[in-house]
């Protein structure tokens, strides 16, 4: 994760737990793409810390649509309520 932005500790823990649920052969690229996207969102808004909404937005942005179902299930299993950020169940 980038040096210019910091991650909220709880958000970072949830991010790493989400990454663990991704198939091993996709983990590396998923971790890189989603973390860069979350940090990019924060940077564009001139903030310094990645929060849960940024992480959720990044996962929805970087995950191919066909995998949104399993991704949503993984988020629900970790107690991440993506619906509060405007995404449908």
Regions found by a protein language model. Give the residues of each.
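Non-catalytic accessory segments flanking P-loop/AAA+ NTPase cores
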Residues: 1-89
